[in-house]
Amino acid sequence: MGIEEKLPSGFLLTTVEGLAGYVRKGSLWPASFGLACCAIEMMATAGGRFDIARFGMEAFRASPRQADLMIVAGRVSQKMAPVLRQIYDQMVEPKWVLAMGVCASSGGMFNNYAIVQGVDHIVPVDIYLPGCPPRPEMLLNAILTLHEKIQQMPLGVHREEVARAAEQAALAATPTIQMKGLLR
């Protein structure tokens, strides 16, 4: 399409990549995927006390086609996993995923066959946010960490290779239904 795909990443485009990273990090459009108590804390982040609008994210998108950040807040059941994957596939590129809470990150205290033991078995996760549930300040810190990561992301072909590698790692992971936990 443009010059960023014709030249290798970082060649003659460092200032353009820096500008593009600055613009991308300031215009994230989150799609909330709230499934449990973490969703309440995520909604509190949009309130006046914590004011997520400071970072350009005042409106959570209802459609995945309008979002580039998915915040998975809470536990994901095996039946919900295909829906999560479908929503991720419908999001626009470049896209990022934030696993909010210990349930989204590792299954939490639900170590059974019905709960996915980590969202990273379904979609590639960029930021893991621990806590049960994590406080709104922690979510804001995770978003700022994601901003730093976006600022450093290269443009063009190399970015697509990194995304493909993360996707393959997520697909190659052991299915959660076959995992053996502490109680099995």
Swiss-Prot record:
UniProt topology in membrane: Peripheral membrane protein
The reaction(s) this protein catalyses: a quinone + NADH + 5 H(+)(in) = a quinol + NAD(+) + 4 H(+)(out)
UniProt cross-references to Gene3D superfamilies, sorted A to Z: 3.40.50.12280
Domain of life: Bacteria
Functional summary from the UniProt entry: NDH-1 shuttles electrons from NADH, via FMN and iron-sulfur (Fe-S) centers, to quinones in the respiratory chain. The immediate electron acceptor for the enzyme in this species is believed to be a menaquinone. Couples the redox reaction to proton translocation (for every two electrons transferred, four hydrogen ions are translocated across the cytoplasmic membrane), and thus conserves the redox energy in a proton gradient.
Subunit organization: NDH-1 is composed of 14 different subunits. Subunits NuoB, C, D, E, F, and G constitute the peripheral sector of the complex.
Full protein name: NADH-quinone oxidoreductase subunit B
Organism: Rhodococcus jostii (strain RHA1)
Origin organism lineage: Bacteria, Bacillati, Actinomycetota, Actinomycetes, Mycobacteriales
